[in-house]
Design a protein with these regions (language model features):
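Conserved catalytic motifs of ABC-family nucleotide-binding domains
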Residues: 38
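Hydrophobic anchor residue at the start of the ABC signature
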Residues: 31, 59
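Catalytic Walker B motif of ABC-type/P-loop ATPase nucleotide-binding domains
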Residues: 42-45
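ABC ATPase "signature
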Residues: 100-101
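Conserved ABC ATPase "signature" region
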Residues: 1-13
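Conserved ABC ATPase signature
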Residues: 17-21
Length: 138
């Protein structure tokens, strides 16, 4: 507990009830708790939502550290720059997996004459537009 408190900057709020904490500290606490058990697989649902940019960066350093130790980490995010940190991405749209692959694979799938080298966000938007066109009669 003390190692995680230090790693996530939680010592200053150790005596506070969790319902009194700002969202950023709640997110830090949740990630620290999940890492204390040294899981083989870690599911993180929008772990950086509601945190400041510095804390967001720190979260990804912790996540990458876990991956380097052999932990499988699955992350849901609406931040496309965060999706690009991942080895593999699954694009879920309207409850369906419509594309999956490495960030480079998804960008290549969505490249066109107008956007020969799309950003991750442009790729996601293009893949969704393509899916909508293919499934417009459903």
């Amino acid at each position: 507990i003390s190692r995680m408190s230090e790693a996530f900057g939680l010592k200053s709020i150790a005596s506070h009830a969790t319902d009194e904490l700002p969202l950023g500290f709640k997110q830090r606490l949740a990630l620290a708790c999940s890492l204390m058990h040294e899981p083989d697989i870690l599911f993180l649902d929008e772990p950086t939502s509601g945190v400041d940019p510095l804390t967001r960066r720190e979260f990804w350093l912790h996540i990458n550290s876990m991956v380097e130790k052999g932990v499988t980490v699955m992350v849901t995010t609406h931040f496309m720059d965060e999706a690009e940190y991942c080895d593999r991405i699954g694009l879920v749209y309207r409850g369906k997996l419509i594309a999956s692959g490495t960030p480079d694979d998804l960008k290549a799938q969505s490249a066109n004459d107008e956007q020969p080298d799309p950003t991750m966000e442009q790729a996601f938007i293009q893949l969704i537009h393509d899916w909508d066109k293919e499934h417009s009669n459903e």
